[in-house]
UniProtKB/Swiss-Prot annotation:
Keywords: Cytoplasm, Lipid biosynthesis, Lipid metabolism, Phospholipid biosynthesis, Phospholipid metabolism, Transferase. It catalyses: a fatty acyl-[ACP] + phosphate = an acyl phosphate + holo-[ACP]. Its EC number is 2.3.1.274. This is Phosphate acyltransferase. The lineage of its organism: Bacteria, Pseudomonadati, Campylobacterota, Epsilonproteobacteria, Campylobacterales. The keyword Transferase applies. The keyword NADP does not apply. It is found in: Cytoplasm. It comes from Wolinella succinogenes (strain ATCC 29543 / DSM 1740 / CCUG 13145 / JCM 31913 / LMG 7466 / NCTC 11488 / FDC 602W) (Vibrio succinogenes).
Length: 331
């Protein structure tokens, strides 16, 4: 049975939604959860019937969001450090954390290490599409400065994740740029283009709107651009929701119309809700690591655990290693 370490302490709202999400996941799938954190706080949140189906790994410290990621390597009693060590030592098959993302990335890279062929890990963000499916964008924040070889590796990792975990038979890869023509872009994207066009599934340069229109499954960029795209998308989604609510309240007609559109709004909200997608896999490390939003609710944690289980079941790292072996980068 798959074993999953869950950092119970690092989220914005404390351990309650993390524990709840773990229990929701247990109700639907079989796995062994290791909740890592302060046992005195975690244990009262667990109903008696679940206490024999999970294990609490007691540690008193945790990395706060406002602290620097560099402090994590010295804080060996912190929840994310202890959870990472479980993964490093092979005591768990996957790690899920809604804590300090910088600390999670640093520890996963330094303590678990990188898989053979990966020079940089990448955060793989899942984005909603107009056709009801999802696309991937990577890197979404792990590497602000990249070389063309890194984008080539990101494309390989994204292709394998999209194919093996998300179920796309023939994923299409696009290079995020400021125009579709090969001549568009900066020095990085132009150099990367010549490498990427040798890959199966590469469709060329894509623009921001292609992330959502269903024309591409894997969108490749450096972490600086990717993180801006991710945060901008979140902001636009929140703004649209707020604007709709404000316009509805302006008149009685708006209120009545909203009642008739209630089911449509529910479906729209679900499609745009980050909790539906769980978290972002950190690809390129020698383990299955899922990084969740700090404000993750129980549903998001549940779905992040499901992501981790699928990654393990589909042997995503083994598939990425094979891809690197047959398509070596030339850094």
């Amino acid at each position: 049975m798959v074993r999953v370490a869950i950092d119970a302490m690092g989220g914005d709202f404390g351990p309650a939604p993390i524990v709840e999400g773990t229990l929701l996941a247990l109700n639907e799938k079989d796995f062994i959860p290791f909740l890592v954190g302060n046992k005195e706080i975690i244990e009262p949140l667990i109903p008696q019937k679940y206490k024999k189906t999970l294990e609490i790994i007691d540690c008193k410290d945790f990395i706060k969001m406002e602290e620097g990621a560099s402090s994590a390597i010295r804080r060996k009693d912190s929840s994310i450090y202890v959870a990472t060590e479980l993964a490093k030592e092979g005591k768990v098959d996957a790690l899920v954390s809604a804590g300090h993302s910088g600390a999670t990335m640093s520890l996963a890279t330094l303590r678990i290490g990188r898989i053979e062929g990966a020079s940089r890990p990448a955060i793989c963000a899942i984005m909603p599409r107009q056709d009801g499916k999802q696309s991937l964008i990577l890197d979404a924040g792990a590497n602000v400065d990249c070389k063309p070889e890194h984008l080539y590796e990101f494309a390989l990792m994204g292709y394998e994740y999209s194919k093996n975990v998300m179920g796309y038979e023939n994923p299409r890869i696009g290079l995020l740029s400021n125009g579709e023509e090969e001549s568009k872009g900066n020095e990085l994207t132009k150099s990367a283009f010549s490498r990427l066009k040798t890959l199966k599934g590469f469709v060329g340069n894509v623009e921001g709107h292609n992330i959502f229109d269903g024309s591409t499954e894997v969108i490749v960029c450096d972490g600086f651009v990717g993180n801006i795209v991710l945060k901008t998308s979140e902001g636009v989604a929140e703004s649209i929701t707020t604007l709709i609510k404000n316009f509805v309240k302006v008149s009685l007609t708006g209120v009545v119309g909203a009642l008739f559109m209630k089911n449509v709004f529910k479906k729209l909200k679900k499609r745009m809700d980050y909790a539906e997608y769980g978290g972002a896999p950190l690809l390129g490390v020698n383990g299955n690591v899922i990084i969740c939003h700090g404000k993750s609710n129980a549903k998001a944690i549940k779905n992040a655990i499901f992501q981790a289980l699928t990654s393990v079941d589909q042997k995503i790292n083994e598939n990425i290693i094979k891809a690197f072996a047959s398509h070596p980068s030339k850094e």
